[in-house]
Amino acid sequence: MMIILASSSPRRREILGRFFEIKVYPANVEERSTVKDSREKSLDIARKKALSVSSKFPGATIVAADTMVIFRGKTLGKPRNAEEARKMLRALSGNVHKVITGYCIIHNGRIIEGVEETEVKFREIGDELLEWYISTGEWKDKAGAYGIQGYASIFVEWIKGDYYNVVGLPIKVVVELTKLGFKPKR
């Protein structure tokens, strides 16, 4: 049995690869959805990713996910530049936001899917610290302009829920794979 991660995310690769031997084949799909609800939207995108890769690897188990940061009802995507990153982080400063990940596993023609939601509270971020963080470039290619596992960990006052969800792949996905008979590596 082979697990294919339908993602180019190094964070998802690291989480899943910690437990299982995997192959990576990024899904080439538009990360957009006409669905309005954030939870349903992340699930819809994850499902599209999984289905697009499953046709190329019959018999393999496919894992796909889509993570979004939601603040005051708005989705914060990946910033296009430093100024967008700065605006996002200023908005999150001192506030609570949600990180939502939709995931989809395709195994033997069966679809297992779900949505994980984690609340994150940021401390107040001063201008000097914000500018230092922007200069690191860590905000690039990250929803909400931060990676909790990196330098941005100093922004976090608390989280309620699954830490790995905030990184990009809920640990529940690992549990689901073990239920399907995959054994974690040693």
Curated annotation (Swiss-Prot):
Which family, according to the similarity comment? Belongs to the Maf family. YhdE subfamily.
Any idea of its EC number?
3.6.1.9
Active site, renumbered? 66 (proton acceptor)
Q: Per the record's keyword annotation, is Cytoplasm included, yes or no?
A: yes
Q: What is this protein called?
A: dTTP/UTP pyrophosphatase
What is the species listed in this Swiss-Prot or TrEMBL entry? Pyrococcus horikoshii (strain ATCC 700860 / DSM 12428 / JCM 9974 / NBRC 100139 / OT-3)
Q: Name the Gene Ontology biological process terms.
A: nucleotide metabolic process
A single Gene Ontology CC annotation of this entry is:
cytoplasm
The record ties this protein, via NCBIfam families, to: maf (TIGR00172)
- Matching Pfam families: Maf
InterPro entries (alphabetical): ITPase-like_fam, Maf-like
Role description: Nucleoside triphosphate pyrophosphatase that hydrolyzes dTTP and UTP. May have a dual role in cell division arrest and in preventing the incorporation of modified nucleotides into cellular nucleic acids.
Which catalytic reaction applies to this protein? dTTP + H2O = dTMP + diphosphate + H(+); UTP + H2O = UMP + diphosphate + H(+)
- Asked if RNA-binding is a keyword of the record, the answer is no
Tell me which UniProt keywords the record has, alphabetically.
Answer: Cytoplasm, Hydrolase, Nucleotide metabolism
Cofactor dependence is on: a divalent metal cation
Q: Where is the site described as Important for substrate specificity found in this chain?
A: 11, 67, 149
Q: Where is this protein localized, as stated in its record? A: Cytoplasm
What molecular function does GO assign, one term?
Answer: dTTP diphosphatase activity
